[in-house]
Amino acid sequence: MRIAIGCDHIVTDVKMAVSEFLKSKGYEVLDFGTYDHVRTHYPIYGKKVGEAVVSGQADLGVCICGTGVGINNAVNKVPGVRSALVRDMTSALYAKEELNANVIGFGGMITGGLLMNDIIEAFIEAEYKPTEENKKLIAKIEHVETHNAHQADEEFFTEFLEKWDRGEYHD
């Protein structure tokens, strides 16, 4: 099984630890960055993870930022992604078994590493349990999606990053 993983600069070390854990369990890890602690933007990495999952390049995805809120919101904008921000086993299992979630999001500064590993492993091993009710619910979720061709462009963030590099944005 191939697992896509991505993070922002705040939790690079957490992502690397999760990546090593997944590899130790025999999973193929597709690491979409970031790879260091240089200030960057979580939507870039959420988008990359989501696109890898939806395209079939990866079977499932894991997104991590400081609280998990930002990157999870970003990955959920990719049409076809159903991601859940979780901090506990019950939420992760519900997301996979009832909503057929294909990405899981974490706050790397919120959820401890060992718990995160346990939750990820349970999420991967859980199976979607289709019922007429949850099939209808998933169809309603998918109906909300709208595709924006502009965002599908690989250069979507280029202008933003060029402005950042020129110092036009500040924290």
Swiss-Prot record:
Q: Output the superkingdom of the source species.
A: Bacteria
Q: What induces it?
A: By lactose. The operon consists of lacABCDFEGX.
For this UniProt record, give its keywords in alphabetical order, as a comma-separated list: Isomerase, Lactose metabolism, Plasmid
- Keyword Isomerase in the entry? The reply is yes
One biological-process term from Gene Ontology?
galactose catabolic process
**GO molecular function terms noted in the UniProt entry:** galactose-6-phosphate isomerase activity; ribose-5-phosphate isomerase activity
- E.C. no: 5.3.1.26
Report the Pfam families cross-referenced here.
LacAB_rpiB
Q: Gene3D superfamilies per the record?
A: Sugar-phosphate isomerase, RpiB/LacA/LacB
SUPFAM superfamilies in alphabetical order: Ribose/Galactose isomerase RpiB/AlsB (SSF89623)
Q: In which pathway does it act?
A: Carbohydrate metabolism; D-galactose 6-phosphate degradation; D-tagatose 6-phosphate from D-galactose 6-phosphate: step 1/1
Please give the catalytic activity noted in the UniProt record: aldehydo-D-galactose 6-phosphate = keto-D-tagatose 6-phosphate
Q: Broadest EC class? A: isomerase
Q: How does it assemble?
A: Heteromultimeric protein consisting of LacA and LacB.
Q: Which family does it belong to?
A: Belongs to the LacAB/RpiB family.
Give the PANTHER family listed for this entry. DNA DAMAGE-REPAIR_TOLERATION PROTEIN DRT102 (PTHR30345:SF0), RIBOSE-5-PHOSPHATE ISOMERASE B (PTHR30345)
HAMAP family linked: LacB
What other note does the entry give for this protein? This gene was sequenced from pMG820, a laboratory-derived deletion of the naturally occurring plasmid pLP712.
Q: Please report the name of this protein according to its UniProt entry.
A: Galactose-6-phosphate isomerase subunit LacB
Please give the organism: Lactococcus lactis subsp. lactis
